[in-house]
Amino acid sequence: MGSLNSIAVLGGGAWGTALAQTAARAGRKVTLWEHDAGNAEHLIAARESRFLPGVRLEPSIQVTRDLAEAARADALLLVVPAQVLRQVVTSLQPLIAPRTPLVACAKGIEHGTHRFMTEIIAEAAPAAIPAILSGPSFAADVARGLPTAVTIAATDAACAQALAQAMNSGSFRPYHSTDVRGVELGGATKNVLAIAAGIVEGRQLGASALAAMTTRGFVELVRFGKAYGARIETMHGLSGLGDLTMCCSTPQSRNFSFGMALGRGEGIESAAHGKLAEGYYTAPVLLEMAQAKDIDMPISTAVAAVLGGKLSVDAAIEGLLTRPLKAEE
């Protein structure tokens, strides 16, 4: 695959804007597509995102509401919520050239179908090359040019390398991989585990409990990954252990802060602060997929039960602490 000189970013929220900034700093021609008229007008007039106040858009970034214009780019970064990805890709499908890389930048699993992000892309745009970008990265850090490393994966090795090269800037370092399943699985699973870690923090159960929750959560991530075909080295890498460690340690993570609010006794609507964390949607799907392969995932199961109103936070914690003793894996 040749050089990817133009990049379109679909989604003008915090993460989309941050990735557009990165691509521009890497020397790419960047188009930032935003479907919401108000947000698009603000981006154009103020040259900054409402979600990243104080961060000026790079001068070379062009903002548009025209999907056809964005679709002409050499590669497209799809920075939209996991549950609307299929709708966006379906709209894109007739507009893109064959073998255009479509890079999912959301971390989740589709409700009802149990499809991962690249599977949705493959189904909705069969002529495209599906890819995934994931890893320990907060939008505010990336937008401000702070050092960040992520993984970009595609089954087409040349495509993965070209995407990594296209997004590489002085502070944003992408590693490339062909383990698509491992990369997207790590990001989706950690969303749920970060809620559990946040509950521990919100309940003020202490640093020891938080370390135990994070470590045993990683065991669940590895179990799930092995069962669904991920490579062990990917799960120990940026998109697995790296992302989990970050999101289980700071309220900058929406899933962690959501869990903290639940741990303090807030209801789900109050804890969401107007926008539910992706882990809320992933938890029941993750549980169904774990049950389908008889994977033991007690922490994820407890989170799903709390979010589904089947267990209180205290009952979930007690259930985990009273499980039969076993050898450490």
UniProtKB/Swiss-Prot annotation:
Its main location: cytoplasm. Keywords: Cytoplasm, Lipid biosynthesis, Lipid metabolism, NAD, NADP, Nucleotide-binding, Oxidoreductase, Phospholipid biosynthesis, Phospholipid metabolism. It catalyses: sn-glycerol 3-phosphate + NAD(+) = dihydroxyacetone phosphate + NADH + H(+); sn-glycerol 3-phosphate + NADP(+) = dihydroxyacetone phosphate + NADPH + H(+). It holds the Pfam family NAD_Gly3P_dh_C. The active site is at 190 (proton acceptor). Sn-glycerol 3-phosphate binds at residues 107, 135, 137, 190, 243, 253-255. One of its GO terms (cellular component) is cytosol. One of its GO terms (molecular function) is NAD binding. It comes from the Bacteria. Disulfide bonds: none annotated. Its EC number is 1.1.1.94. It is found in: Cytoplasm. Pathway: Membrane lipid metabolism; glycerophospholipid metabolism. PROSITE patterns: NAD_G3PDH. It is an enzyme of class 1 (oxidoreductase). The keyword Cytoplasm applies. InterPro entries: 6-PGluconate_DH-like_C_sf, 6PGD_dom2, G3P_DH_NAD-dep, G3P_DH_NAD-dep_C, G3P_DH_NAD-dep_N, NAD(P)-bd_dom_sf. NADPH binds at residues 15, 35, 107, 139, 254, 276, 278. SUPFAM superfamilies: 6-phosphogluconate dehydrogenase C-terminal domain-like (SSF48179), NAD(P)-binding Rossmann-fold domains (SSF51735). One of its GO terms (biological process) is phospholipid biosynthetic process. HAMAP family: NAD_Glyc3P_dehydrog (MF_00394). Catalyzes the reduction of the glycolytic intermediate dihydroxyacetone phosphate (DHAP) to sn-glycerol 3-phosphate (G3P), the key precursor for phospholipid synthesis. Belongs to the NAD-dependent glycerol-3-phosphate dehydrogenase family. This is Glycerol-3-phosphate dehydrogenase [NAD(P)+]. It comes from Rhodopseudomonas palustris (strain ATCC BAA-98 / CGA009).
